[in-house]
Every structure is written in C-alpha cells, then in structure tokens.
Amino acid sequence: MKPVIAIVGRPNVGKSTLFNRLTGRRDAIVADFAGLTRDRHYGDGKLDNHEFIVIDTGGFEPDSTSGIYKEMAKQTRQAVAEADAVVFVVDVRAGLSAQDHDIARYLRATGKRVLLAANKAEGMKDGPQLAEFYELGMGEPLAVSSAHGQGVRSLIEMALEGIEPPEPEEGYSEEELRNRPTRLAVAGRPNVGKSTLINTWLGEERLVAFDLPGTTRDAIHVPFERGDKKYELIDTAGLRRKGKVFESIEKFSVVKTLQAISDANVVLLLIDATEGVSDQDAHIAGYVLDAGRAVVIAINKWDAIDSYQRETLQRSIEQRLAFLKFAPVLMISAKKRQGLGPLWKAIDDAWASATRKLPTPQLTRLLLEAVEYQQPKRAGAVRPKLRYAHQGGQNPPIIVIHGNAVEHVTEVYKRYLEARFREHFKLVGTPMRIELRASHNPFVSKDS
C-alpha cells in the first residue's frame, strides 16, 4: 500500500504550500464531512518511483476546547493516526512559539515518526534561526522552502526512509488471469449504499474468508467466489460483523478509499441516485482516472427517483463525469437486488479490457488506417509522421506510437486515435494511455 505522510503545524507556517509542492495539484480530495469548518485535504505525491499519499491539515492547536480550532485539532489528530510519517512544519522566520511546543508535546506522545521542517528558510542551511528549534526535541530541524522547493526532496526521502515501495505488477498471461482473483474496490461517499451492496453480495455468494482490519486505515479484504470466478473485495465501507450480517461503521476514511483504489484491479464507483453527482464523487472519480484503474459506475437507489429526476441525473453524469465516458454506467438497487447481474458482467468486461493483449501488427495497421483517414495537423511547415505502434503495458493499456515530429501531435488527435483503438478492440471500462516516441532517423549523422 502507498505510505501516508501527514503535514501538521500551527496556522500560517506554509503547510498548504508544501502540500501543493508535493502533489503538484490544487484539486485534492477533501474530507468534506458535514459540520466541519476546516477539512483534511488528500493528494498523491511521487518521488522517483515511490508513490505516497499526502494529508494537509488545518492550523493545529492541540489543547483547543471550543469552536473552529477544536474541530481543526480533531481533524489533525485523525490525520496523524492515519499517517506512516508526520512532517511537523514550523516557520523559521517567525521563530519558535508556544504553539510549536504544544504540538511537539502532542506528537511525541503519539510515538509516530516525525520530521521537523523549518519552512521559509530560503537560502538558509544552518545558523541561529534554526538552532532554537532543537528545543522542541524533534531532532534536527530541516531547512526547507515550500515556495521554492529548497530541501523538499531531502525531506520526503527521509520521510519515506525504510518504507519499501510496492512491487510493480507485471503483465499477466491468460492462464494467470483466469486463476488470479480480481481485486475489486467499492468506493463512494458515506451512506450511498456500499455496505448494503456488499451484504447483498456476501449473502448470495460463498464467503471464503473475512479478514478483520489491523488498524483504522487498513481496508478489509474479502475473498469470495461467484460461479467459477474468484474475486477479492477491497472494502472501504468499514464493515464489522454483527450476528450474521456486516454492519457499517459510520466512519468515512479518505485514506482507506485511496489505498483501496490503488490496490484494486477494478473500482466500482457507487453514486446515490437521490443525491446526484457531488463534488466528492467527481474527486474520487478523478483519482481513479489518475491511478489508471478500470472503473464501473453504479447508480444506486435508482428505483427511488422519478423519470424527471432520472433525466436530470443522467445529464449530470455526462457533464460532471465526462472524463470517465469510457466507463459503463449501470442503474441498480442494492436493497432490492436489482441490476446486479449486469453489474458483474460490466466488472468482468472492464478487467478483461484493462488486461487485454493488443498485437503489434493490429495496432500498427489501425494506426496507419487512422492516419490515412485523418492526418495530424501541421505545426508550421512540419506535419507529424506516425509510423508504427505497439503495446507498452496493461492495466491500463498503454499504446506506444513511434514517429517523427511527434511532439507536435495535439491532445485532440491523441483522443481521436484512442477512440479508434477502443472501437476496434472493444475496450470498455478502462483508461488508456497513449505515449508518443520519436523514431531514430539513421540518415541523420551525429555530427550534423
């Protein structure tokens, strides 16, 4: 699983700037629970081949007992509990404060691995400004500048020290795919029906095992079989055994959801028909796309809305989830067990598409036919020339296209090629990556 790094500190020390520096984006997933005045932000970071999850928190005042700061402290404590490592940010220019001491005292009590980041240290490697922060008992303060990137790489290298990155998955043979369980993550906001759907599945299929989570951030893995096919359900709903059923613990963990998506082969994004597509739904969908996972969208409680609401919802899906237009959308009722057969077929089809072998001769022929039908646009006097294609990976399918002047191929033209490949191979429910590589021209000498 991806390691988790939490960023904590008092207000206005540059935590969000560091978060944006690490994630490279500002549209992070937010834990937008009702009543919270300051939320935890979640995003993906990557250092070389090591991927990780970053949590940005509000200004932390551990001893706050009322108002906004009490809620912010509660959120920060949750982030620390979910984290493998904590980056404690202080403001080197403002100097040491009583709040810094309070936070340090709290972090020491948690037993978490903590790195002290002395932020706003532009051009500063050591000196008296850093020395006073040794008083916090957090070890050596690391001089960083979130705004300029100074020292950030070293900081994250130290945070990830001792945490091995997960092994990359290799391509699978057809026999391996038949014998290997399909890992399925059920993702969605709280109360959209995840636990109801899972209970329905586990009630009608043979339950092989049930592995209780070791910590609050571990997803539950439930191996089970349906017919002659094996699956491993990665549950984010937070289920616990209660008699003969599994009861949902009313606690939504963004980290658990992101971990489950990363670990999954296929993600089932569950949306509540009575509430429509929310910002949180769109954020989770965007994360699925970024992770390159096969995805199926299921609209639960479809039976609870009228025809006008259904038309409105379908338009909302087309607009707000347009970037997942390759994903099948199915209407279900988990409670009434309606639409579950087609849902399983869509899940199987999505995984088959994500792992399909695409022969080089067919890819090249399709590429040349597509170019003959519609050439890439010229860039000045230069027109890109695309020569051949081959598969560069699975889950998601990666198609590598070789040619000349490929840097001038537009995103619009890449989408055109993707549509041609999808149509021919009947690929559904999976993202596709197209990589363009310049071909070596043997007639150009190295000296010219």
UniProtKB/Swiss-Prot annotation:
<dbReference type="InterPro" id="IPR006073">
    <property type="entry name" value="GTP-bd"/>
</dbReference>
<feature type="binding site">
    <location>
        <begin position="9"/>
        <end position="16"/>
    </location>
    <ligand>
        <name>GTP 1</name>
    </ligand>
</feature>
<dbReference type="InterPro" id="IPR015946">
    <property type="entry name" value="KH_dom-like_a/b"/>
</dbReference>
<dbReference type="InterPro" id="IPR003593">
    <property type="entry name" value="AAA+_ATPase"/>
</dbReference>
<dbReference type="GO" id="GO:0042254">
    <property type="term" value="P:ribosome biogenesis"/>
</dbReference>
<keyword id="KW-0690">Ribosome biogenesis</keyword>
<feature type="binding site">
    <location>
        <begin position="188"/>
        <end position="195"/>
    </location>
    <ligand>
        <name>GTP 2</name>
    </ligand>
</feature>
<comment type="subunit">
    <text>Associates with the 50S ribosomal subunit.</text>
</comment>
<feature type="domain" description="EngA-type G 2">
    <location>
        <begin position="182"/>
        <end position="355"/>
    </location>
</feature>
<feature type="domain" description="KH-like">
    <location>
        <begin position="356"/>
        <end position="440"/>
    </location>
</feature>
<dbReference type="InterPro" id="IPR005225">
    <property type="entry name" value="Small_GTP-bd"/>
</dbReference>
<comment type="similarity">
    <text>Belongs to the TRAFAC class TrmE-Era-EngA-EngB-Septin-like GTPase superfamily. EngA (Der) GTPase family.</text>
</comment>
<dbReference type="GO" id="GO:0016887">
    <property type="term" value="F:ATP hydrolysis activity"/>
</dbReference>
<feature type="binding site">
    <location>
        <begin position="56"/>
        <end position="60"/>
    </location>
    <ligand>
        <name>GTP 1</name>
    </ligand>
</feature>
<keyword id="KW-0677">Repeat</keyword>
<feature type="domain" description="EngA-type G 1">
    <location>
        <begin position="3"/>
        <end position="167"/>
    </location>
</feature>
<feature type="binding site">
    <location>
        <begin position="300"/>
        <end position="303"/>
    </location>
    <ligand>
        <name>GTP 2</name>
    </ligand>
</feature>
<dbReference type="Pfam" id="PF01926">
    <property type="entry name" value="MMR_HSR1"/>
</dbReference>
<feature type="binding site">
    <location>
        <begin position="119"/>
        <end position="122"/>
    </location>
    <ligand>
        <name>GTP 1</name>
    </ligand>
</feature>
<dbReference type="GO" id="GO:0043022">
    <property type="term" value="F:ribosome binding"/>
</dbReference>
<dbReference type="GO" id="GO:0005525">
    <property type="term" value="F:GTP binding"/>
</dbReference>
<keyword id="KW-0342">GTP-binding</keyword>
<protein>
    <recommendedName>
        <fullName>GTPase Der</fullName>
    </recommendedName>
</protein>
<dbReference type="InterPro" id="IPR016484">
    <property type="entry name" value="GTPase_Der"/>
</dbReference>
<comment type="function">
    <text>GTPase that plays an essential role in the late steps of ribosome biogenesis.</text>
</comment>
<dbReference type="InterPro" id="IPR027417">
    <property type="entry name" value="P-loop_NTPase"/>
</dbReference>
<dbReference type="InterPro" id="IPR031166">
    <property type="entry name" value="G_ENGA"/>
</dbReference>
<dbReference type="InterPro" id="IPR032859">
    <property type="entry name" value="KH_dom-like"/>
</dbReference>
<feature type="binding site">
    <location>
        <begin position="235"/>
        <end position="239"/>
    </location>
    <ligand>
        <name>GTP 2</name>
    </ligand>
</feature>
<keyword id="KW-0547">Nucleotide-binding</keyword>
<dbReference type="Pfam" id="PF14714">
    <property type="entry name" value="KH_dom-like"/>
</dbReference>
